[in-house]
């Protein structure tokens, strides 16, 4: 009866293959731009980068949802909703170690931005662990620069490089409808473009992941056009 049918081992096999591909691409001087049906693939990208160097890097995670559940907090068992917590070493620990290059992210190297739909226990866990969180409402009230700049400057004092994660559901569905899970109150493309430009000015973006774009919800192509422009803003 679950709406999220999934075989965990198959997912982690995919993450492992992606990690190996990321390492190969970076070794060949290519920039990894990963398009995936969900956010779990980020575990492959992040740990592919980890496998290349011991030098720490940050993760800036734009998503309507926290993706910070664990098997102990998730009300649905949805694996995709646990990937950021897993990357931080807080869930699926044995499976995570099967990914080449895996090592837990430091919490102080994570920024979650654009959220507006958190599960209650997930939100408590993020607060308990001290995840830097800038919600969509803060960006609406202060602007992208005003809301994000303090957190980005703090992260820049710790790392030089980042992985940029962009779940399409962070966008406002009434403007860019290309995701089934998006809820109202999302970011406008202009706000996200400003945010991505700020990232590019402060960090070396080592890789970028784009998750959960569903073209069947984007009949007029609005989301696709916005995503293309946002990729240009982030990586040129």
Predicted regions and their residues:
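Conserved alpha-helical scaffold segments that buttress catalytic/binding sites
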Residues: 1-236
